[in-house]
A protein has these predicted regions:
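Low-complexity, intrinsically disordered or signal/transmembrane-proximal segments
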Residues: 4-5, 15
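Secretory targeting and sorting signals
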Residues: 15, 20, 24-54
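Cell wall/extracellular polymer interaction/catalysis modules
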Residues: 55-217, 228-240
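Short cysteine clusters
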Residues: 220
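Conserved "landmark" site that anchors the functional core of diverse proteins
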Residues: 224
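Charge-dense polyanion-binding interfaces
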Residues: 242-245
């Protein structure tokens, strides 16, 4: 929502399995996960926690069994900070911190609503990824879009991805309708946030984590494309985004 197979990894060694010959060597396994977190943060160019130091993040009680979390906390206005977290054998560890992101032009709001230009607070699933660019890899389903891809804000298809020629679409594709064409620069890469999964009209549609154009969004979370690609490569099914002021 702009203003107007081998497991791929975000950072090498982030996901590590115990060496088969040393399955009971818990110390070695924890060491490797910790090293992976530090290496990941270095590659991203951001700060990380000391090796092996588990922390208690603000969202811990709200994300259930999730092991990957994108934490987005407001820094005022339409800007926020994203931290990338992984739950390991010793608890939660940040694998990337202090990533600057843009949120809604009106900041954040307790609940999503069409047209309020605010990013909804809460915890949301990260359902699948899409973009105008080829699939960068990762654990999420990825859809490469063309000019025939839309996110509908109308009728029975409200808050769903649709594929149709503009002249053949059964929903209003005009910008005034709220429907979005998904073949635009801000959607070079994007991740679908599970906002309003019940698809109740008026309760919000088309909330994504997507490539930034350098300005505030209509309610999405936007960041630089290089970092977003790394995140997409790292994400696995079950990951969530947690948003707060």
């Amino acid at each position: 929502m702009p203003t107007y197979q081998r497991r791929r990894r975000l950072w090498p060694n982030l996901y590590l399995t115990p060496v088969e010959a040393s399955r009971n060597d818990e110390g070695m396994r924890r060491f490797r996960v910790s090293v992976g977190a530090v290496v990941g943060a270095v590659l991203l160019g951001v700060a990380s926690a000391p090796p092996g130091v588990a922390q208690t993040p603000w969202f811990e009680a709200t994300v259930g069994n999730a092991t990957q979390v994108l934490s987005v906390v407001s820094t005022g206005g339409s800007t926020a900070k994203m931290d990338v977290w992984q739950r390991g054998p010793t608890g939660w560890e940040p694998v990337g911190t202090g990533i600057g992101v843009h949120v809604g032009a009106n900041g954040m709001a307790p609940q999503a609503h069409d047209g309020n230009m605010a990013t909804p607070m809460g915890v949301y699933s990260l359902d699948f990824a899409f973009g105008t660019k080829p699939n960068p890899g990762g654990g999420l389903t990825y859809v490469q879009t063309t000019p025939d891809y839309w996110w509908s804000s109308q009728g029975p298809t409200y808050n769903t991805m649709q594929v149709c020629k503009k002249a053949d679409c059964t929903f209003d594709t005009s910008p005034a309708s709220g429907t979005e064409n998904l073949y635009i620069p801000q959607y070079a890469h994007a991740i679908v946030m599970g906002v309003n999964k019940e698809r109740i009209p008026g309760n919000g549609a088309a909330f994504f984590v997507h490539t930034t154009d350098g300005g505030p969004t209509a309610g999405c979370v936007a960041l630089d494309d290089d970092t977003l690609v790394k995140i997409i490569r790292w994400l696995q099914p079950g990951a969530v985004i947690a948003i707060a002021q």
